[in-house]
């Protein structure tokens, strides 16, 4: 999936993401850089709506929602789950979807 298609497909799921407690979603990695192969997964990190109870089970639910909707593997994490040594670089290259 190329960058523009991935952005459009993720943006089209904004309502479903918001309904699941997501305040913001960002595409990063090879797809965001325009370097994805046909079989590449989508790397996404999210910010959770403030004052929302959100667990690991909720995060897994969002991952499954996106994978079912997009028909592609999604590597999903929260902003806080980004590796501290890579976080600045990931945030610089990330494309905000929601």
Regions found by a protein language model. Give the residues of each.
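Catalytic core of pol beta-like nucleotidyltransferases
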Residues: 1-24, 33-38, 49-98
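Conserved histidines in hydrophobic membrane contexts and catalytic metal-binding motifs
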Residues: 27
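P-loop (Walker A) phosphate-binding loop of NTP-binding proteins
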Residues: 30
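A short, structured beta-strand/loop element
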Residues: 38-40, 44
